[in-house]
Amino acid sequence: MTDKAKRFPLSLSSLSEKAPRNGARSDPQHVAGKTATPQTATLNASRHGKAPVVPRQQDVPHKIAAPTAPRSASLVSDAIRKAMTARVAKQGVTDSKVLAAMEAVPRHLFMEPALASQAYIDASLPIGYHQTISQPYIVARMIEVMRNNSNAGVLNCVLEIGTGCGYQAAVLSLVAKEVYSIERIKGLHELAKSNLRPMRVANIRLHYGDGMLGLPQAAPFDGIILAAAGLEVPQALLEQLTIGGRLVAPVGDRHQVLQLIERVSKFEWKSSTLEDCHFVPLRPGTVT
């Protein structure tokens, strides 16, 4: 990769060794656990909240400090992420900035300790509430497509529908200046906040609400990613794209395809089909 991977502003030792919810130590190499689910999905959409508008930041740098974990543990974690990223590249993802972001984010910190040993395989994994964290390839693929825009890949402001555990938002934070993410399930919204808080990522804004309504108070967006599949993309989301912006979403019921929608003008959008995929269904409203 030509782009040097950024580092989160966190101590990986404090995060990797934090006591998990059940009191067991989280170790991505030695934790026995559940098997991965075959779904390549993320999360349902969320409710439009009426919280005050947060002023936009002006290209605030969001670099990540070098880890202070014991060198052996750090090298193991780095090696696993490098191997995962190399596998994603072999699957066809070529955007060096996306690959660097995937390599920088410790995926095992976003899931239960019992599944940490499977964190870097190319599969989705359960995160609770009948939802999953998407497989690494699909995360990288969707972000790569969104970045391949007419603005040389620059993303000033992006919207994620379906925060889930917060992993994809963390990856997005390294390729976009501002990231807004909506989650409709309250428990997952709180989980994402808990996962991201120690990482001190300044350019992520998490919202609890109905993602099918988007986030008009923060629009327009250069890119929008949906982590749940509807029969069609909600019109409200299309209208929140900036002209030249890109929306990437799974569309369909039993048979789903990844679809790219580009906004050409105020009243015109064009779409193209990318590949088959499988996501959880897009649902309206919220779950408390």
UniProtKB/Swiss-Prot annotation:
This is Protein-L-isoaspartate O-methyltransferase. The gene is pcm. GO terms for biological process: methylation; protein modification process; protein repair. It is found in: Cytoplasm. Signal peptide: none annotated. Residues 1-61 are annotated as: Disordered. The keyword Ribosomal protein does not apply. The lineage of its organism: Bacteria, Pseudomonadati, Pseudomonadota, Betaproteobacteria, Burkholderiales. Belongs to the methyltransferase superfamily. L-isoaspartyl/D-aspartyl protein methyltransferase family. Residues 36-45 have a biased composition (Polar residues).
